[in-house]
Amino acid sequence: MNPSAGGILSPDHAAALPPGPAQDALLKAVTTEISDKGFVLASVDAVVNWARTGSLWPMTFGLACCAVEMMHAGCSRYDMDRFGVVFRPSPRQSDLMIVAGTLTNKMAPALRRVYDQMAEPRWVISMGSCANGGGYYHYSYSVVRGCDRIVPVDIYVPGCPPSAEALMYGILQLQKKIRRTGSILR
């Protein structure tokens, strides 16, 4: 694999490669470029997005039974730390909010307040049927019919409750979305 004019970290190579020959070839190309030139050519967007995808810090907003599956995903069996996902207790330290469960009308202002306390860039994952659209309680007078009416949602994870694997898949989809976005204004 020869480095292109755009550098090793061009948008074509920005996606994470699974272990194997393709990853070995990429690592060899990076090592060769560093030893030849002493530096690696990359766009600032690719480096910033690579750092953001590898260090998502979610703040949990567990409202109902979906929160149990969210805790399950954070435990040792699924080990979200290997994807750079480390749960944080404060919204000021977080860049991802996972809304898991039924959002009531009384809880909606608190959700918005916590979202506003998060630093930019920030993302939201809506987890479960209740957070996505009201779910089982859709016709109740006290339920918000989807948290996207209160905060902008990036990824929807369906299910009642969704499995830990579904949440992991949603986080991986969010990482893909972050890789595709441009973060530096031109």
Curated annotation (Swiss-Prot):
Q: List the keywords (alphabetical).
A: 4Fe-4S, Cell inner membrane, Cell membrane, Iron, Iron-sulfur, Membrane, Metal-binding, NAD, Quinone, Translocase, Transport, Ubiquinone
Domain of life of the organism encoding this protein: Bacteria
Q: Give EC number(s), comma-separated.
A: 7.1.1.-
State the similarity comment. Belongs to the complex I 20 kDa subunit family.
Which Gene Ontology terms describe the biological processes this protein takes part in?
Answer: aerobic respiration; electron transport coupled proton transport
Q: Which organism is it from?
A: Paramagnetospirillum magneticum (strain ATCC 700264 / AMB-1) (Magnetospirillum magneticum)
Q: How is the cofactor bound?
A: Binds 1 [4Fe-4S] cluster.
Q: What is this protein called?
A: NADH-quinone oxidoreductase subunit B
Required co-factors: [4Fe-4S] cluster
Query: Where is it localised?
Result: Cell inner membrane
Q: Which GO terms describe its cellular component?
A: plasma membrane; respiratory chain complex I
What this chain does, per the entry, is described as: NDH-1 shuttles electrons from NADH, via FMN and iron-sulfur (Fe-S) centers, to quinones in the respiratory chain. Couples the redox reaction to proton translocation (for every two electrons transferred, four hydrogen ions are translocated across the cytoplasmic membrane), and thus conserves the redox energy in a proton gradient.
| Subunit structure as annotated in this protein's UniProt entry | NDH-1 is composed of 14 different subunits. Subunits NuoB, C, D, E, F, and G constitute the peripheral sector of the complex.
Reaction catalysed by this enzyme: a quinone + NADH + 5 H(+)(in) = a quinol + NAD(+) + 4 H(+)(out)
Annotated positions binding [4Fe-4S] cluster:
C65, C66, C130, C160
Q: How does this protein lie in the membrane?
A: Peripheral membrane protein
| Enzyme class of the recorded protein, top EC level | translocase
What Pfam family is a match for this entry?
Answer: Oxidored_q6
Q: Which GO terms describe its molecular function?
A: 4 iron, 4 sulfur cluster binding; iron ion binding; NADH dehydrogenase (ubiquinone) activity; NADH:ubiquinone reductase (non-electrogenic) activity; quinone binding
